[in-house]
Regions:
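Short, compositionally biased, intrinsically disordered N-terminal export/targeting signals
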Residues: 1-25, 29-37
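Extracellular carbohydrate-recognition regions
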Residues: 39-70, 155-157, 163-168
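Short carbohydrate-recognition loop motifs
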Residues: 73-101
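Extracellular-facing segments of soluble proteins and assemblies that are Gly/Ser/Thr-biased and enriched
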Residues: 98-182
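Conserved, mostly hydrophobic/aromatic
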Residues: 191
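Short, surface-exposed, low-complexity cationic segments
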Residues: 197-222
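Long, compositionally biased interface segments
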Residues: 214-267
Length: 267
């Protein structure tokens, strides 16, 4: 372990070289609205190809999968809608109470040892509300589901671990902020500066929270996993699924989250 650590612990794993990108999905091409690569997606003009309000409603097509994933206590209604391979949205009406209510998301399966991956990166574009309590994040699992890596992109809390959403942590400040305490601060990986948090929710969880919030960009997942490995959290893990969505704690009155241009490149 590194002598610069502020606290302590950590650990992600499942086959097949592929490149997931919008250009390679001819089956979906007519179902996807044209969107710019650097701006948030407009509201889809067409009817969805699939929609569900079931708590665990799920849909798979052409190597992608989606799940409504409403799992928290006291959760309200939520509807996920898919318009194409890289375009989907969720309407969610969650009460202003504590605790995550849902994590609607899109996912692809990687299924390779980290050492066998030369490139693992992802692009995202999103349109999010100003209110509520939520964080948009990648959720990356090893194949054994022992280790979970969360990479936040935007959130309603603060980068120091305070605010109305907080990353999982072993340690929280004993003051009114109740802020999660990072194990590393101002880490530069993949062109982004992060605060890093460590905790356990039944799995070993490492969360990277960017100092600057963003609604579009590219994430160097391979670089992040290698950095975590270099700190002794795990060895040559088998990277399982890469998910992207929004952890919703509250969205009173109903709020819309829209996602487009999401793609994962692995080779």
């Amino acid at each position: 372990m590194d002598s610069n650590r502020i606290n302590r612990a950590g650990s992600p794993e499942a086959p097949m070289e592929y490149v997931r990108s919008q250009e390679h999905h001819d089956l979906f091409r007519q179902a996807v609205n044209a969107v710019g690569g650097s701006v948030a997606a407009p509201a889809p003009a067409k009817a969805p190809i699939w929609s569900s309000s079931a708590p665990y409603g799920s849909f798979s097509r052409d190597g992608y999968s989606w799940n409504n994933d409403v799992w928290g206590r006291g959760a309200g209604p939520q509807t996920i809608s898919v318009y194409g391979a890289n375009q989907w949205s969720v309407w969610s009406n969650q009460p202003a109470t504590g605790g995550i209510k849902s994590y609607p998301h899109e996912a692809v399966h990687v299924g390779k040892p980290l050492s066998a991956i030369n490139t693992l990166s992802s692009t995202f574009t999103q349109d999010v509300p100003k209110g509520g309590a939520w964080d948009t994040a990648y959720d990356i699992w090893d194949s054994s589901n022992q280790h979970e890596i969360m990479i936040w992109t935007n959130y309603t809390g603060n980068p120091d671990g305070s605010g109305n959403v907080k990353p999982i942590s072993y340690h929280y400040r004993q003051d009114p902020s109740g802020a999660a305490i990072p194990v590393y601060r101002n880490v530069q990986v993949g062109g982004t500066t992060w605060n890093v948090f460590e905790g356990n929710n039944g799995h070993n969880v490492i969360s990277l929270v960017p100092i600057s919030k963003s609604n579009s960009g590219t994430v160097d997942i391979k670089g992040i996993l290698e950095w975590i490995k270099s700190k002794g959290y795990f060895g040559d893990i088998n990277v399982g699924s890469v998910q992207y969505g929004v952890e919703i704690t509250s969205s009173p009155g109903g709020m819309n989250f829209k996602f487009s241009n999401w793609a994962v490149t692995s080779k």
